[in-house]
């Protein structure tokens, strides 16, 4: 199994495209991470919108550059809104990304996510336990936390990618991105990133935005992982702990965009 490493040059090119296109991202994400997700997208040059009402969600999915479905705080009413948005995204050819938070641990959200898969997500982003559960290989995870190493989920990610046509991202100490055939690995980041709520969810929003960019979607999605890990490393170097990490992380994302424009 060959894993190609993401190049800094490709990531810089994708970030330049990102800034040029400034994707409008419809984030149907969980209540815990909305502000952090929006600020992450803004720092990179995208435009976030958090539209959740069923009638509006369907309408907005048609005009957005990309749609994110994150089931972290799923309710039946929210599920209805998400279904309406996904159906409209499919009709409007709006790329959409699924973040199957904690599907390995909870039955309702696992059933809901499995019902969404026939609508052909452009990308799926999760930790190892989530991806393995969604692929039907194993159920597990401790809530939103993984109990499996990212590398162990590569076969499940490849299977899921081939079955759905999605780019599948498995995040961990090393991230892996696959279309079912090619596999790209992304080094970096820091364990402190796991002590801040929302870093994975925010990555899913950036992945969604990258699905709206022209060019190689696999490379663009891998670039999203690279930016987040780069920014995480820079932020940790300036931080004293989780509390000071967040502002330094947002600053680091902003600085990355400034560097590619210089």
UniProtKB/Swiss-Prot annotation:
InterPro entries, A to Z: Hyethyz_kinase, Ribokinase-like
Binding positions (ATP): 125, 171
Entry EC number(s): 2.7.1.50
One of the Pfam families matching this protein, by short name: HK
Pathway this chain belongs to: Cofactor biosynthesis; thiamine diphosphate biosynthesis; 4-methyl-5-(2-phosphoethyl)-thiazole from 5-(2-hydroxyethyl)-4-methylthiazole: step 1/1
Chain sites annotated for binding substrate: 50, 198
Signal sequence range: none
Keyword Transcription applies: no
GO molecular function: ATP binding; hydroxyethylthiazole kinase activity; magnesium ion binding
GO biological process: thiamine biosynthetic process; thiamine diphosphate biosynthetic process
Keyword vocabulary terms for this entry: ATP-binding, Kinase, Magnesium, Metal-binding, Nucleotide-binding, Thiamine biosynthesis, Transferase
Cofactor dependency: Mg(2+)
Reaction catalysis annotation: 5-(2-hydroxyethyl)-4-methylthiazole + ATP = 4-methyl-5-(2-phosphooxyethyl)-thiazole + ADP + H(+)
HAMAP family, per database record: Thz_kinase
Similarity remark: Belongs to the Thz kinase family.
Function summary: Catalyzes the phosphorylation of the hydroxyl group of 4-methyl-5-beta-hydroxyethylthiazole (THZ).
Name this protein carries in UniProt: Hydroxyethylthiazole kinase
Organism, scientific name: Shigella boydii serotype 4 (strain Sb227)
Source taxonomy: Bacteria, Pseudomonadati, Pseudomonadota, Gammaproteobacteria, Enterobacterales
Gene name for this UniProt entry: thiM
């Amino acid at each position: 199994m060959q894993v190609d490493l993401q190049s800094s040059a490709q990531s810089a090119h994708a970030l330049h495209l990102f800034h040029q296109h400034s994707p409008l991202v419809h984030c149907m994400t969980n209540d815990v991470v909305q502000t952090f997700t929006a600020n992450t997208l803004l720092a990179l040059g995208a435009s976030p919108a958090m539209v959740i009402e069923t009638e509006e969600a369907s309408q907005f999915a048609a005009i957005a550059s990309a749609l994110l479905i994150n089931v972290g705080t799923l309710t039946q009413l929210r599920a209805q809104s998400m279904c309406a948005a996904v159906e409209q995204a499919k009709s409007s050819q709006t790329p959409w990304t699924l973040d199957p938070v904690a599907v390995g641990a909870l039955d309702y959200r696992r059933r809901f996510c499995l019902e969404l898969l026939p609508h052909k997500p452009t990308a799926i982003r999760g930790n190892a336990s989530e991806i393995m559960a969604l692929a039907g290989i194993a159920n597990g995870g401790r809530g939103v936390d993984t109990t499996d190493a990212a590398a162990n989920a590569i076969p499940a990610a490849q299977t899921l990618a081939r079955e759905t046509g999605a780019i599948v991202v498995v995040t961990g100490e090393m991230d892996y991105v696959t279309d079912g055939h090619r596999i790209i690995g992304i080094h970096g980041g820091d364990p402190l990133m796991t002590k801040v709520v929302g870093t994975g969810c925010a990555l899913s929003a950036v992945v969604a935005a990258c699905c709206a960019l022209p060019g190689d979607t696999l490379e663009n999605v891998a670039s999203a992982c690279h930016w987040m890990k780069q920014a995480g490393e820079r932020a940790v170097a300036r931080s004293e702990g989780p509390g000071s990490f967040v502002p330094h992380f947002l600053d680091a994302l902003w600085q990355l965009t400034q560097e590619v424009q210089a």
